[in-house]
Amino acid sequence: MKDKKQLKQAINALNRIMEAELAGVVRYTHYSLMVFGYNRIPIVSWLKGNAEESLQHAQKAGEMVTLLGGHPSLKIGALLETEKHDIGDILRESLEHEKSALACYHDLLKIAEGNSVLLEEYAREMIVKEEMHVDEVNKMLRRPGDLEPFQE
């Protein structure tokens, strides 16, 4: 990136992504410990997989920060304990988290467009992944046979 202001904006956006993804690690790990009932095993496995993927996403964002000469954040994104552990509540909170992460990647894309092919491609790749996560959670929240996207 040529412009120092844009470089700083990109590093800040990447740090926000890293923080959001690290919050996802904690969130999904917590959820995996709070699932009970007949469907526990596949749901716990799915949640643990999301925690692992969030960690990989955080690491990738951190690598981008250092590639640009920045310092990766030690902060973690917002974590609110709702004390609701019904699987529907967990999935609704997961959907909000995924949408929030998606917004962070869109913010990065706006900064990168026309300034860095590397960051543009990274942001686009991650937007695709996050949109797939949003869709997956949305489908899990639907009643069997519902074709319309879930809306609260």
Listing of model-derived features with the role each one plays in the protein:
Residues 1-152:
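Iron-associated oxidoreductase/ferritin-like identity signal
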